[in-house]
Design a protein with these regions (language model features):
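Short secondary-structure junctions and interdomain/linker hinges
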Residues: 17, 58, 76-79, 252, ...
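Low-complexity, polar-biased intrinsically disordered regions enriched in Pro/Ser/Thr/Gly
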Residues: 3, 94-105, 494-507
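Outer-membrane beta-barrel porins/channels
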Residues: 28-42, 48-49, 121-526
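Residue-level detector of conserved, well-ordered beta-strand and adjacent loop positions
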Residues: 52
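Outer-membrane beta-barrel translocator/receptor signature
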Residues: 46, 58-67, 72-150, 239
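Bacterial Sec-dependent N-terminal signal peptides
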Residues: 1-31, 526
Length: 526
């Protein structure tokens, strides 16, 4: 079992899973808070997506209610629009460990409704209601290693040090008593003990006392090579429902505001497994399943203004307040351990947990957007956006999260892990003939992680293109968006040792995501 230095501690905390033995958010740290705070470029409408999302200074599109609400006052007519889409994700997971490197890739395809909008325009004033999908969590990944020397059971042994064996058994009259006695952080270890992955060390609890130390050597002989695998399936979205209003001052100054109400859900199913080639004694294989279900609602405010100093130029600015979120979660797990030879007449051991429920509040960072666009005669538009997001201001606002928010002597807090990001978006629209529009866009976001050694993780790039047909009654737009990012590496399992520093495996998983979005928008004017 490896003890890490402070740099590796930062990696383990920031790199995602933190501990497969403790998947509740209170045990994980700040990675889920980042997940619900980072939208990248969203999905939105086909017109805005085709232009790379560079829409801070533009308007008269359903996406403006979630970008710069001043754009709603640019509508010259009332409109109803919907944007269904198809999202294809490809997730690559490279496993690097003592046995070498292995690459694996899985894909996922899912249809969706990216946005919906209704706008009523009356002269200089417009109001609207809409829905924009800000984030999509649907995906699958698999990471496979080989020749590892450490087992997740070794982490569990360290995790349960000092806990009497009599407290973590499963008596027939109350099989879940151990789980109600200890927090979910220890549930993985309890599952391992009850399924027979490791044994108590006799005599470690004092005279006539139950053992308080454990060992895997009865199941995993020294020198045994392990073949770990982590399969992950995620689903969920962040949808934002918007109520917007805007006013147009003589086509020179446009102002607007949006009340955003977010609907959030996220599900994650993990199966971590280990297998050996041993046939005569001990462990044959283990399977550790975990389910995390999260749902919540949040509220925020957006305000914006756009000025048109000359007919061909627009300059826009918008501020997005933090989103205040109330989140609920459920977590449960199960473990099955298969033996090479029957133990007490059984070929395998099994244990599962009850459902752990928790509720807490969180705050996402604020955002500042600025954009400039120019009309090129009657044939085109060029638009450029800049966005700043202060991820160091993310925070859990409920009790019990002080160590995550502020850090400890062994683990860094949110302000040490995260910093501000800079995002640029650029888009062009060209009208070669009447009613036909061609579009292209690009976007780039810097990493939210602090430290030069981490900056290559979390960067996001996006390329897009689109085509549109528009007349006085209907708009039909189609866009294709391709995005790619390298996520923070993480350990397949990790926990804090008795000295306060993480104890973990040799293996590290390096995820890379690619996604393809096809968006069709149809809007009717009246």
């Amino acid at each position: 079992m490896k003890k890490q230095n402070l740099l590796q501690v930062t990696c383990t905390v920031a790199f995602g899973v933190a501990a497969l033995a403790a998947e509740s958010v209170r045990a994980q740290g700040s990675d889920e808070l980042l997940r619900f705070s980072r939208y990248n470029f969203g999905i939105a409408t086909a017109r805005s997506a085709g232009m790379g999302g560079a829409y801070t200074s533009l308007g008269a599109d359903g996406a403006t209610m979630s970008i710069n609400p001043a754009g709603i006052s640019m509508y010259g007519h009332s409109e109803v629009g919907i944007s269904p889409g198809l999202r294809i994700t490809s997730q690559r997971a490279d496993y690097s460990g003592s046995g070498g490197n292995v690459s694996n890739r899985l894909g996922n395809t899912k249809g969706n409704i990216g946005s919906f909008s209704m706008v009523y325009a009356n002269g200089n004033f417009a109001v609207g209601f809409g829905m924009n999908r800000l984030a999509d969590f649907n995906g699958r990944s698999r990471a496979i290693g080989y020749g590892e020397q450490f087992s997740i059971g070794d982490m569990f042994v360290e995790q349960l040090y000092g806990i009497p064996a009599s407290n973590i058994g499963a008596p027939e009259n109350d099989i879940y008593q151990a789980f109600f006695r200890y927090p979910p952080k220890l549930w993985g270890g309890i599952l391992g003990y009850q399924a027979g992955l490791f044994d108590p060390v006799a005599g470690t609890g004092g005279p006539d006392q139950p053992s308080q130390q454990y060992t895997t050597q009865g199941m995993i002989q020294p020198g045994t090579l392990l073949y770990p695998e982590l399969y992950r399936r995620t689903s969920g979205t962040v949808n934002e429902y918007t109520i917007s209003g805007g006013y147009n001052f003589k086509d020179i100054l446009y102002v607007g505001a949006t009340l955003g109400i977010q609907d959030i859900y996220y599900n994650r199913f993990d199966t971590y497994s280990e297998a050996t080639t041993v046939t005569n004694v001990g462990l044959h294989s283990l399977f550790y399943d975990q389910n995390l279900r999260m749902s919540g609602a949040g509220v925020n405010l957006k305000v914006g203004a756009t000025v048109r100093p000359v007919p061909w130029l627009r300059i826009g600015v918008a501020y997005h307040s933090p989103t205040w979120i109330n989140m609920s979660e459920e977590y449960d797990g199960a473990m099955t351990v298969f033996y090479t030879q029957p133990i007490a007449g059984y070929d395998y051991g099994f244990s599962d947990t009850p459902i752990s429920r928790d509720e807490y509040n969180m705050r996402t960072p604020s955002r500042l957007l600025a954009g400039i666009s120019a009309t090129i005669g009657s044939v085109g538009i060029v638009s450029l956006d800049y966005e700043r997001v202060w991820y160091q201001d993310m925070k859990y606002t409920s009790d019990g999260f002080q160590d995550i928010n502020e850090g400890t002597t062994a683990t860094p807090g949110i302000r040490e892990l995260y910093g501000p990001t800079d995002m640029v978006r650029a888009g062009v629209e060209f009208q070669p003939v009447r009613s036909l529009f061609l579009r292209a866009g690009y976007g780039y976001s810097t990493s939210p992680y602090r430290g030069s050694e981490f900056r290559r993780y979390g960067e996001y790039q996006q390329w897009s293109g689109g085509i549109g047909f528009r007349n006085h009654r209907v708009n039909i737009d189609l866009a294709y968006v391709y995005g790619t990012t390298r996520e923070m590496p993480f350990k397949p399992y990790s926990d804090t040792g008795s000295d306060g520093y993480p104890v973990t495996t040799d293996g590290t998983i390096y995820p890379r995501d690619k996604n393809h979005n096809l968006i069709l928008s149809v809007a009717f004017k009246f």
